[in-house]
Amino acid sequence: MSTTAYPDTILIIDFGSQVTQLIARRVREANVYCEIVPFQSADEAFKRLQPKGVILSGSPHSTTDIGSPRAPQAIFDAGIPVLGICYGEQTMCAQLGGNVESGHDREFGRAFLDVQEDSPLFAGIWAKGTRHQVWMSHGDRVTSLPDGFTIIGTSPNAPYAVIADEKRKYYGVQFHPEVVHTPDGAKLLQNFVHRIVGVKPGWTMGAYREQAVEAIRKQVGSGKVICALSGGVDSSVAALLAHEAVGDQLTCILVDHGLMRKDEAQQVVEMFREHYNLPLILVDASDRFIGALEGESDPEKKRKTIGRLFIEVFEEEARKLGGADFLVQGTLYPDVIESVSFTGGPSVTIKSHHNVGGLPERMKMQLVEPLRELFKDEVRLLGKELGLPDSFIGRHPFPGPGLAIRCPGGVTRGKLEILREADAIYLDEIRKAGLYDAIWQAFAVLLPVQTVGVMGDGRTYEFVCALRAVTSVDGMTADFYHYDMNFLGNAATRIINEVRGINRVVYDVTSKPPGTIEWE
């Protein structure tokens, strides 16, 4: 549920599509606020949000199946614009008196749309009589239209590829405008929200900042607030927003578990204390964490140990402050979107994300989540709005367990220091080559393998370092970065020459899938 209220909202009803979040991203990129809700709770959300327009998502289901998801009748009774995408088009037709059938020629992948009529939906992008690339993914198709609808676009296997009831402002598209494979899709969605729904592009990070600050003040009142600062972008932006809202009522706690990148803890402390005058406590708990991890090779046990110790240390520090009433977390919108479950009946699974585990319950604190309505790219824009430097905002993702999961096998302080130095050199080489912003994530891994080498006149038996770099849009899928071999040669030479304990460097050329980005 929203922590703030937006009068000009688009409601996206999720029927279980894998790309529903992309619809929301495109609407947000048009500077319009939107929310995703599962079809099971769409009635309640429609009443609560009173949206200006509705978008119906795709679905893995068939409208011809008994009990298949439906849109609430209330949206068709409200007299507001509706856009149905793929399954959304089909269920809208079926619910309004048209017909949908299964078993016709399927369309998966690239297709070409022939524009039959001009429409506000196509304004500025497609004209009558032209042909355009779109992305299809459907097995069912509309075979007859409800009263009031006309065909405004066709494809070879979808005669009702785009339909419209211009009077009621109901539109249906059989293709997916939200994916990048429909080149003009983002503009089509902009046409729907701006021209057809009539919402002005007022959703900006400047406006969000003002509303979020006001919402935090209203929630917190005169209470005491603490924030677990990790050094990452999300927690940092959340902390700055909270500080702008409540000032000295906020104290940030940064737990240095000894698993951060080179000089990272000190850099974060300097930035927040000196540049932002933020009350910040740095806790050096590295001995405690590394001692508990010593020799542990199971990646899941590493994660659980780190999570448990973090809660213990944070709890101890919070008690030293006399406790707190509120805990700030950098939870993002994808973490809290309700996901649709078709296999478990009508139940809805809530994806939750807590940066600090069970702390709120254990310490009887209320959560303050000022970023829970934002996607990651919006958080970066908000960080810029708050004055965070580009060098910080654009940093590569870093896992919560830190270097512990980039050190397969047993963790020791010595191995962590070797890895930290190698990682710093690798990232330095990437920056010097001007490649940092072209790569989604890059890091070094210290393998639990030693190999024979020759350095000078002597024989060595030292660790192998693996280098990893991937390109990605969202981290869900990734391809390895295709370096020039000269770059890899230079990086490997520097690491071997400057880091005692490594005598061999390899490069990981695994994509995701089948591999994951991190090694553990």
Curated annotation (Swiss-Prot):
EC number: 6.3.5.2
Gene (name only): guaA
Enzyme class: ligase
Pathway involvement of the protein, from the record: Purine metabolism; GMP biosynthesis; GMP from XMP (L-Gln route): step 1/1
Function: Catalyzes the synthesis of GMP from XMP.
Binding-site list for ATP: 230-236
UniProt catalytic activity: XMP + L-glutamine + ATP + H2O = GMP + L-glutamate + AMP + diphosphate + 2 H(+)
A Pfam family per the record: GMP_synt_C
One Gene Ontology cellular component: cytosol
Protein name: GMP synthase [glutamine-hydrolyzing]
